[in-house]
Amino acid sequence: MTTETLTTLEQHDRFLGRHIGPDSEQRQEMLNYVGAESLEDLTTQIVPESIRLNRDLAVGDNVSEAEGLAYIRQIADKNKVFKSYIGMGYYGTEVPSVIQRNVLENPGWYTAYTPYQPEIAQGRLEAILNFQQLSMDLTGLDLASSSLLDEATAAAEAMALAKRVSKAKKANIFFVADDVFPQTLDVIKTRAECFGMEVVVGPAEEAVNYELFGALFQYTNRYGQITDFTELFTALHEKKAIISVAADIMSLVMLKSPGSMGADVVFGNSQRFGVPMGFGGPHAAFFVSRDAHKRSLPGRIIGVSQDTRGNRALRMAMQTREQHIRREKANSNICTAQVLLANMASFYAVFHGPQGLKVIAERIHRLTDILAAGLTAKGVELVNNTWFDTLSIKGLDAKAVQKRADAAGINLRVDSCSESDGSSDQVLGVSLAETTTRTDVTQLFDVILGEGHGLDVAALDAQVMADSTSVPAELVRQDAILTHPTFNRYHSETEMMRYIKRLENKDLALNHSMISLGSCTMKLNAATEMMPITWPEFGNMHPFCPQDQAQGYAQLLGELSEWLVDITGYDAVSLQPNSGAQGEYAGLLAIKQYHESRGDAHRNICLIPSSAHGTNPASAQLAGMKIVVTACDKAGNIDMEDLKAKAAEVADNLSCIMVTYPSTHGVYEETIGEICEVIHQHGGQVYLDGANMNAQVGLTSPGFIGADVSHLNLHKTFAIPHGGGGPGMGPIGVKKHLAPFLSGHSVVKHGLESDGNGAVSAAPYGSAGILPITWMYIKLLGKQGLRESTQVALLNANYMMKKLSEHYPVLYTGRNDRVAHECIIDLRPLKEASGVTEMDIAKRLNDYGFHAPTMSFPVAGTLMIEPTESESKVELDRFIEAMVSIRAEAARVESGEWPVDNNPLHNAPHTLADIMDPEFDSRPYSREVAVFPTAAVKQNKFWPTVNRIDDVYGDRNLFCACVPISDYE
């Protein structure tokens, strides 16, 4: 019989032991190896005393997984899920169960990283390529990106693209039709102000009256009207304008494509293709342009290339456009986008196929026709005379209708519409969706007209079938869509399940092995944390629903904000930015507006260390700032003398510094407090990039250090999964003086001083639908668990660093020869001695069953390794064994035993086709060395499905659509 107390026994179900990889015995063994008595001793050795946080976090104690689920269930139950007819870019949809279970709830899909290592990412690359093909087919344009953050930010990117490529070089006006969604206009205005562009809003037909570089139109517009823009677009092209169209993805199944009308860019939200509304996100925006503008396209693009065997292989194409290479000259600061949601949308299209999508679109349209016929029969006046799914109604007693709608559990849209005489009239909007039924239409008649209307859906159906003019004949799509075999094969659940599984098997994710990407924090995304995001109480909430219906979300967002304020040491938090890059942008906007409020609009210079991530200069450029780069010293720290000199030199115009902490070199810089003081002395603000927050939580904080603003990557430090390239969340924390300058929103207001500020995202709380993950993470770990997680992250990194230092030089260390949560190993001496490159080692790790660490950042010719706290000593040792074995292989190249151009590193990764090839016998190493280099690999072999991919071939022969049908024959 046990002698332990009940309290001790109750602790056994706590989450901490599930989240942290090394158990107590493993931890002690690792501590002994690195030369520390305890986690506290190791923390003291690593974290500078001047920034050490000597208090507990105020986030409460940890709870069990069952308790956490019970708590969040109580919160979810406070949300009232009404039937939503609000529309405005967010609609009811049916998530096919085969996709929910096998993609959204599958760690093989949601724990993968952005496919920088394409040889072990062919599955999701194919799914993303399907998304691009879907986007191109529906829009009628040539080249699509893999996804953007949301429809409104896609609009801002379209404006930026138009400015880059328009031949109307002297023009500075971007025209926006006055019937676009208000949240889209909001984000455009925010971006335009930073770029110094003039936004003119007016009726669509007035666009020709301006000297402009670009214009934006909504198809269908916010009131539901469908317009043939062909003649208008022709006239605008004569003025050298670039034309962008915000389009509804479901309507494009039925309607003439914007590309065929002459649009240059088409974008929109793919949410209604099987992704829940989620109180605003996450959702994947599609973005498509003409081929002529390919070098200016924002976001990532998947292209077709070939591997060393000449076989078809997929990869990210034209990466030289992106922030991690082009920095402040990049097309966009977009990094993480919405790949998981793009994959869900693409699988939705694959599952339904063109005929299934047509049935869904025609059903939505038919029900809208029926609703319109019934209303007009009763004398109701419609604002629009054409429509796909949306009706705008005027002349009714809006309050009476709203009262009946509330009683019926229905949300309608209350809008305003400009009249020809300049006045404005209140209108009610109704947008139908895939989830709408004939019973719902009858209920809408009851709500809008009152009971006793006598309308019969079946009779109205017969009427509209015989005579419907809601879509003019010239606007009915005539061309075939989704003709590729992929969209016409997998319509049974069995076939769909197997297709998804076949793609999943090609990818390496956290459910197979550690992904030790430095600066990416690929930690556990626990199943219990993930569960609530699929609950309808969170998933089926419209972001613009009445606030009294979203009390559960209000509580969750409020508690999460309080916790993040405490963890960061700041005074206020904005949850609106829906990626880390957007967080940077929002934080810099707050700094910019703060200076302007003090009459210091001239302060526009941003100091950025040379070691910074590429998003930093890209975001600063986006905020209209000029970048001045500061040097780093030989130890990898910010060169204080250079910083002081440059801060003094630009003091009159200094806006801020962007600094990462711990540094991108993986150390706690001792001078961080002094850096903050120098910037403040010269009138600037300190932006502390939260990318490395996993080494701060519970030990120090940006606010305590002296920073003014930071973004937090919730998809790194706070357990939201990476999803193969998104979703992410990048909320920002600020000191009190910056709080009035946080992002506002034109649709949802909260009575705050920041309400009048521009938005950076389409939804007021960004991708609110995934915030329950972070809420659960903090709730389950509690104050002690969060701190201990950070400490174990330090332990794992230092254990790995010391083990690897016996075989590879470690580039940078901090006090007491320690690193923070990541370390950089220098491969340049090895390359010089043997000819083995960092690329060779990265690809060889695939043969050992590992994703490569971050390659050549922040220093070329290096690998940056971040194991996180979630990895056990067993997994760390397995990775270390692989790296040691690879070093031994490189030694055989160095000695001349293996040729530089014919060895297991140069030829990596190896596929089944390699070892089945009779010509393999001519290689100077065995098949076993190629694919089973250690005993551990035999126990858990991952097979890359393609050989090393030819990047140059892919960019020289750019092809970014599904491969031709002949490849399938």
From Swiss-Prot:
Gene3D superfamilies: Aspartate Aminotransferase, domain 1 (3.90.1150.10), Type I PLP-dependent aspartate aminotransferase-like (Major domain) (3.40.640.10)
A Pfam family recorded for this sequence: GDC-P
Enzyme Commission code: 1.4.4.2
GO terms under cellular component: cytosol; glycine cleavage complex
Domain of life (superkingdom): Bacteria
Cofactor: pyridoxal 5'-phosphate
Keywords carried by this UniProt record: Oxidoreductase, Pyridoxal phosphate
N6-(pyridoxal phosphate)lysine, modified sites: K716
Enzyme class: oxidoreductase
Catalytic activity: N(6)-[(R)-lipoyl]-L-lysyl-[glycine-cleavage complex H protein] + glycine + H(+) = N(6)-[(R)-S(8)-aminomethyldihydrolipoyl]-L-lysyl-[glycine-cleavage complex H protein] + CO2
Residue ranges crossing the lipid bilayer per the database entry: none
Any GO MF annotation of the entry: pyridoxal phosphate binding
GO biological process per UniProt: glycine decarboxylation via glycine cleavage system
Family (UniProt): Belongs to the GcvP family.
Biological function: The glycine cleavage system catalyzes the degradation of glycine. The P protein binds the alpha-amino group of glycine through its pyridoxal phosphate cofactor; CO(2) is released and the remaining methylamine moiety is then transferred to the lipoamide cofactor of the H protein.
Assembly information from the UniProt record: The glycine cleavage system is composed of four proteins: P, T, L and H.
Name used for this protein in its record: Glycine dehydrogenase (decarboxylating)
Native species: Shewanella woodyi (strain ATCC 51908 / MS32)
